[in-house]
Amino acid sequence: ALPPIEHRLQLRPAGDYFIIDDAFNSNPAGAAAALEVLAAFGEGKKIIITPGMVELGEREYQLNFEFGGQMAQVCDYIILVGKKHSKPLYDGVIAANYPLEQLFVAADLNEARSQLAKIVEPASVVLFENDLPDTYNE
């Protein structure tokens, strides 16, 4: 059997909650599949941390907007990373009438992790979807 690829839908325990690490290079099909995996967990809060997708050309805004709507259907909490870059995701989440008190925008991954620490609880499942270098964040 082939070993799993690092940061490709890797499920791992983190104390009393779980992490789905899908931080390696996100694309629309992969991001949707990762959300399906997250949705399949019955118990616990479903949380996503993502900066969105990059290098999608002229459809980048639209594809991220749509992903925002998909996240709103599945996630109990959404933590976006990078205020400027995550705007299309934010717009998609808002368009889906997602509760604002469950939506957070972090400047960087450290701030996202701090926010996560405030909301995570036992049996939560946290999806890390894509990981951008700090050059994309402000």
Question: Which positions does each model-derived feature cover?
Answer:
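ATP-dependent carboxylate-amine ligase
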Residues: 1-138
